């Protein structure tokens, strides 16, 4: 969940004879990776926070030790099943993109953004610096290792090769670069980006990434050459205040950001920014009104639609003028020319957080934090329908992530 003004000591208050050889190797790698991915179960990860609560009187923190990560099997996309949980720290203080699965389906990465520290009867959020690595091919899935990254690791991105990952560190004002080989994940470098980094996303060619600079209301650009990553501060784009959600279309033409505004659930309409992302100099081409607090967004596998988790006023105290009991899911269409339109909306539960498309793109899943459920929505053309099916979860769903 977005937190404006997150000093470490403030309690939670709201919510390519060599060319041929290389070509053959590349083809072989593609075949192996594709086969591995095809054989891997269609899992989605859900981070379950057990230490931060949205009570009628306002937000409240509690002790550590009650978080977990759930593994959802979406073989039947209309009826996902929770098949396993692991007791691992994670937090709603990290954005709903603080976990993900490698393209071959082998590993899950989960950032632990904060831990709680007790002072008297109150619990205060303190930045953590850990990344959990889960072997999803093990039976049952198991924790392989925990890797140190930057302070308050938040959004995670994994490139299409599955060999490189980036972690946005909010309190660290940085992005950590990691290599992935088999089940081994290693930190290569941490890059200063100059502002709080809430989320990160790769361009499909892996040569560029984007980083959401939360408090600066900017989208940063990273250039990538192998494992060398450089922050291109001269290419920063103005998006919207509280930029939190971030996604790039599969063809790399368009990037979207969810801008939660100066304060979450304040009753004011917020925006999604549309970026033409494939030029030498990316540019913002539009801003769409989306409602109060677009917490997270996802782009369909075919790149034709995006779905947005809109909290509305559900994270506010019930006596607040901005309070609403429920959130919403908004559906956006993405045209071949890059034009983005809002085409549908459906009601959701209380304090919507993570949002992902099913592997086929026919369904959208959204986590309803307070309700402790996963909502299932059907996408047909430009329509979005609540199927009515809810997956009951053993904790509060703070994040969702797939491949």
Task: Show the residue positions of the predicted features.
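Predominantly soluble domains enriched in secretory-pathway, periplasmic, or organellar proteins
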Residues: 37-403
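Bacterial N-terminal signal peptides
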Residues: 25-34
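Short, positively charged and aromatic/hydrophobic N-terminal segments
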Residues: 11-12
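Positively charged n-region of N-terminal signal peptides that target proteins for export
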Residues: 3, 16-19
């Amino acid at each position: 969940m977005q937190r404006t003004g997150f000093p470490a000591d403030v309690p939670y208050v709201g919510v390519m004879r060599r060319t041929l050889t290389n070509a053959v190797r590349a083809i072989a790698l593609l075949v192996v990776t594709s086969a591995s991915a095809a054989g891997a179960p269609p899992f989605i990860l859900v981070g379950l926070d057990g230490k931060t609560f949205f009570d009628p009187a306002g937000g409240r923190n509690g002790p550590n030790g009650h978080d977990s990560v759930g593994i959802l099997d979406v073989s039947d996309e209309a009826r996902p099943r929770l098949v396993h949980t692991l007791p691992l720290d994670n937090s709603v203080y990290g954005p709903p993109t603080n976990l993900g699965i490698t393209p071959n389906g082998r590993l899950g990465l989960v950032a632990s953004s904060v831990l709680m520290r007790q002072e008297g009867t109150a619990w205060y959020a303190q930045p953590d610096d850990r990344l959990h690595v889960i072997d999803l091919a093990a039976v049952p899935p198991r924790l392989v290792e925990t890797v140190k990254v930057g302070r308050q690791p938040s959004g995670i991105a994994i490139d299409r090769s599955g060999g490189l990952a980036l972690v946005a560190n909010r309190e660290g004002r940085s992005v950590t670069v990691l290599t992935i080989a088999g089940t081994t994940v290693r930190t290569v470098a941490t890059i200063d980006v100059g502002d709080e980094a809430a989320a990160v996303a790769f361009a499909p060619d892996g040569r560029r990434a984007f980083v959401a600079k939360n408090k600066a209301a900017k989208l940063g650009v990273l250039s990538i050459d192998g494992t060398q990553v450089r922050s291109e501060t001269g290419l920063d784009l103005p998006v919207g205040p509280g930029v939190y959600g971030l996604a790039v279309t599969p063809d790399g033409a368009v990037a979207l950001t969810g801008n939660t505004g100066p304060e979450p659930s304040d009753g004011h309409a917020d925006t999604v920014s549309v970026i033409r992302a494939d030029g030498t100099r990316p540019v913002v081409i539009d801003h769409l009104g989306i409602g109060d607090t677009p917490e997270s967004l996802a782009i369909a596998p075919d790149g034709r639609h995006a779905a947005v988790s809109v909290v509305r006023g559900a994270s506010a105290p019930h006596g607040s003028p901005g309070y609403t009991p429920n959130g919403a899911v908004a559906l956006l269409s993405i045209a071949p020319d890059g034009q983005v339109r809002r085409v549908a909306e459906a009601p959701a539960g209380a304090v919507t957080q993570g949002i992902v498309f099913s592997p086929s793109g026919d369904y959208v899943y959204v986590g309803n934090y307070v309700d402790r459920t996963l909502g299932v929505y059907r996408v047909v053309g430009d329509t979005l329908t609540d199927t009515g099916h809810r997956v009951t979860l053993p904790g509060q769903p703070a994040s969702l992530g797939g491949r």
